[in-house]
Regions:
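Helix-turn-helix/homeodomain-like alpha-helical modules used for DNA recognition
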Residues: 82-116
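Residues within the DNA-recognition helix of helix-turn-helix
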Residues: 56-59
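Helix-turn-helix DNA-binding elements, focusing on the entry/boundary residues of the two helices
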Residues: 38-40
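Short amphipathic alpha helix immediately N-terminal
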Residues: 23-35
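Short, Lys/Arg-enriched N-terminal segment that forms or immediately precedes the first helix
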Residues: 2-17
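Hydrophobic positions on the alpha-helical face of helix-turn-helix-like DNA-binding modules
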Residues: 28, 42-43, 53
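C-terminal flanking helix
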Residues: 61-68
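Helix-turn-helix DNA-binding motif, specifically the short coil turn and the N-cap/start of the second
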Residues: 49-50
Length: 116
């Protein structure tokens, strides 16, 4: 995974699961991924060592990955987004219905709650 895709992924995971992290981990990850601050800048602004920043980033990323592995919200959102993009270009009604059924499957297999 290249750097840009990694940043995009962790920005998304942070927006989904950020509240489940410790305040310190969340703050450091936001500074690193959202504001593109260097490890040195983060260390200086938080009065901690570079090693502490690197450790917080590493542990925070691991936690975000664990949350995603367990809950799959990012994956499901990505699948739904791809299906919706596909649906926008469909001209055939039966193909559109098929895509809508795929979206329903993703929603029903996940933790999404749908009020009917």
């Amino acid at each position: 995974m290249d750097d840009l895709n990694r940043i995009i992924k962790y920005n998304s995971l942070l927006s989904i699961y950020g509240e489940l992290l410790s305040t310190r981990q969340k703050d450091i990850l936001e500074q690193y991924f959202n504001f593109n601050l260097s490890i040195s800048e983060i260390a200086e602004s938080n009065n901690i060592s570079r090693a502490a920043v690197e450790d917080a980033i590493k542990k925070g990323q691991k936690k975000l990955d664990e949350f995603e592995l367990e809950l799959n919200i990012y994956k499901e959102k990505s699948e739904i987004r791809a299906l919706l993009d596909k649906a926008q270009n469909v001209k055939d009604e039966s193909e559109l219905k098929s895509i809508l059924e795929e979206i329903k499957k993703v929603i029903n297999n996940g933790i999404w709650i749908v009020n009917a």
